[in-house]
Design a protein with these regions (language model features):
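P-loop NTP-binding core
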Residues: 1-153
Length: 154
């Protein structure tokens, strides 16, 4: 039943995916939420969008956390893992959730804005081909590499 629901959702959301010209292999969609102001929810929106599409809609996603130096998403993931590791009830709940979903947490890759696209490309070249790669960029276009990273988005 779950597989049919995922396939049904993929048919609905198919327009957001792109196909490469080489043997119709899937090419990930690169997405970033950006604004020149910090503290307006870009990281929160990135996590919500990635989590919704991954856990509820069945898409394979990855997140490139290039909000250097704080790497908020990677830091949040680390704190969550530490909290789960320190509490038996959280361990049980996490195990039940991941067992029910049949998947682990989506990957979060740390990078810098100037290396963000290369980080995603290397991940994909290593054989990990998600449907969508989200990029969490700094809250200013004055940071080195932000403009070039934005130019690489779909």
């Amino acid at each position: 039943m779950k597989d049919r629901m995922i396939e049904s959702n993929k048919q609905i959301y198919q327009p957001i995916m792109k196909e490469s010209n080489m043997e119709n292999e899937k090419t990930p969609l690169y997405v970033a939420f950006s604004t020149q102001k910090g503290g307006v929810g870009k990281t929160t929106f990135t996590v919500l969008a990635a989590s919704y599409l991954y856990y509820l809609k069945g898409y394979d996603v990855a997140v490139v956390d290039c909000d250097y130096p704080q790497h908020s998403i990677a830091g949040m993931r680390k704190r969550d893992a530490e909290q789960v590791g320190a509490d038996e009830d959280y361990k049980r709940m996490a195990y039940e959730q991941f067992t029910r979903l049949g998947k682990k947490a989506y990957p979060v890759l740390c990078s810098s804005p100037e290396k963000a696209i290369a980080t995603a490309d290397e991940y994909i070249a290593a054989g990990h081909v998600p449907d969508i790669v989200f990029f969490d960029l700094p809250g200013t276009v004055n940071s080195e590499g932000v403009i070039n990273s934005l130019a690489g988005m779909d």
